[in-house]
């Protein structure tokens, strides 16, 4: 059985740690900071076998050099010279095997042009999506276009409903409060917001989410919903799905 453990970093990042059964060799995803990873590994008597990287931003890669020097893990990620110590470059429709699980790689440009996601099929599947899909939201468009991000999210939304979503940040409460403004009449979203508020009061993560849940609560996966489109029409163009998505993303940036 593969266990996924969140290691908090910075103000709101999650570094995900993957451990197969009782193995002392683990995998981590997007180590922006080495220190909390080292502390966890040393405390638990674990060694680092591999690092998965979703994109080049420093808060997802800043710890790689120190971890490579200490543990010599295999580093797997997209083709970008800004990412240190890559051993295995992967891109769209590639596969890699770590911790006994097969991971499919999806190109998901939008937040950055090099952004990829790692998906392990199964019951449930596991999706490590970095800053592309958040619970209740999506990443800002630093390099890509709204059309690219819309396509990337549609690809992730097509995964099975029970797929567990491991995003890179704890942004859920802020995202869901924006979602209330964008789509006021959504009881499923409101119920989930209450659950997430209680979780955060107890200092518990709101992640993982699931694809099925995100399809119910996340406005960026609900562009075709009439209530959302009515609200978006007051903010900008809704001439087609890409235009509506761009309007929604711009509104969130200003919110």
Curated annotation (Swiss-Prot):
It comes from the Bacteria. The keyword Metal-binding applies. Pathway: Secondary metabolite metabolism; methylglyoxal degradation; (R)-lactate from methylglyoxal: step 2/2. Zn(2+) 1 binds at residues 55, 57, 111, 131. SMART domains: Lactamase_B (SM00849). Gene3D superfamilies: Ribonuclease Z/Hydroxyacylglutathione hydrolase-like (3.60.15.10). GO terms for molecular function: hydroxyacylglutathione hydrolase activity; metal ion binding. Binds 2 Zn(2+) ions per subunit. Zn(2+) 2 binds at residues 59-60, 131, 169. Keywords: Hydrolase, Metal-binding, Zinc. Belongs to the metallo-beta-lactamase superfamily. Glyoxalase II family. Monomer. HAMAP family: Glyoxalase_2. This is Hydroxyacylglutathione hydrolase.
